[in-house]
Regions:
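Acidic helix N-cap motif at the loop->helix transition within catalytic regions
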Residues: 9-11, 37-46, 67
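Short aromatic/hydrophobic "clamp" motif used to bind/position activated sugar donors
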Residues: 81
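Glycine-rich, basic loop-to-helix element that forms the pyrophosphate-binding segment
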Residues: 59-76, 98
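Short, acidic, metal-binding catalytic loop of nucleotide-sugar glycosyltransferases
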Residues: 15-25
Length: 305
């Protein structure tokens, strides 16, 4: 469990892990990244109360989200690693028991994930995610439905991922979980459990939910660039053209609601003609606004393979 400035949420996240009913021992690693609020005190308090169940992973200086994520995972000692960020929580006390049972029953499985409830902080809006659970590499390239807070993976494969992919050499990747799950899809089999086991809190300040459309586009571009890299390395580049189109589609969808489409066309080096801009605006703006009115933040293409 990685955490940074999660004082209002971290206790609930920790308690949800402690509430798991399992036939095996569970060790909770708290990766606390020198928060400026009371998160460190809360984490230290829990670690002191449960010394046999909780281990604190921290340092004297902030190391950043991605480094904290990695050092916390690498500190794990069990056969399996389950992930829950400090602002999320598990809502099913049988979550770990059921997922580990699936992995134990089939050694070819590297990862098991479940459905989640996305809770949008501030508005209280809820979204049951995903509508379609994907497991194959080709489809996950376009729509990675593996929610981090629902995943349970084999630790030896995670270590292989870090050694083989070397994500630290890719600062352009803005997340650590998306590339990891793409690697699992390419190098092992993925299973899904049809149950809602976790709540993913969508904070306004998170990179994926930023209201600033330039940051939102940068995040979407990063996800597509990650998919392009994995397609080139593990998919022989067979999806390159479609992934490039998808990257543009998603960016244009964001701009159709938040900003000028012509700006993105110019930034990508496309001819920003009135006809092209008008065509893109009409194509995306009406559909995007309708979906957002219905409470669905995803672009029109999000569920298509």
């Amino acid at each position: 469990m990685t955490t940074y400035n999660h004082a209002p949420y971290i206790a609930r996240a920790i308690e949800s892990v402690l509430a798991q009913r399992t036939s095996f021992a569970v060790e909770l690693l708290l990766g606390e990244d020198c928060s400026s609020d009371s998160t460190p005190d809360i984490c230290r308090s829990y670690a002191a109360r449960y010394p046999d169940r909780i281990r604190l992973v921290t340092s004297e200086h902030n190391v950043g989200m991605r480094a904290n994520y990695r050092r916390t995972i690498e500190a794990c000692r069990g056969r399996y690693v389950a992930i829950c960020d400090g602002d999320d929580w598990w809502c099913d006390p049988e979550k770990l028991e059921r997922q580990v049972a699936m992995l134990e029953a089939d050694p070819s499985l590297g990862l098991c994930y479940t459905r989640s409830l996305r809770l949008f902080e501030g508005t209280g809006r809820e979204l049951h995610y995903p509508e379609v659970m994907l497991t194959d590499f080709d489809r996950l390239l376009f729509n990675n439905t593996v929610e981090n807070c629902t995943a349970v993976a084999r630790r030896d494969l995670i270590l292989r991922y870090y050694a083989e992919v070397r994500p630290e050499e890719h600062p352009e990747w803005l997340t650590d979980d998306a590339p990891m799950w793409l690697w699992f899809a390419a190098e092992s089999r993925i299973a899904w459990l049809d149950a809602e086991t976790a709540v993913h809190r969508m904070l306004p300040q998170s990179v994926s939910q930023s209201g600033l459309y330039r940051k939102r586009i940068a995040f979407c571009d990063s996800l597509m660039d990650t998919s392009l890299w994995f397609d080139a390395r593990y998919g022989a580049g067979r999806h390159r053209y479609r992934l490039l189109c998808r990257r543009s589609d998603v960016a244009l969808w964001v701009l159709s609601y938040h900003g000028p489409v012509g700006e993105y066309l110019a930034r990508r080096g496309w001819p920003s003609t009135p006809r092209a801009t008008d065509c893109c605006s009409k194509r995306y703006s009406s559909d995007a606004r309708e979906r957002l009115r219905e409470g669905d933040p995803r672009p029109p293409c999000a569920l298509r393979p």
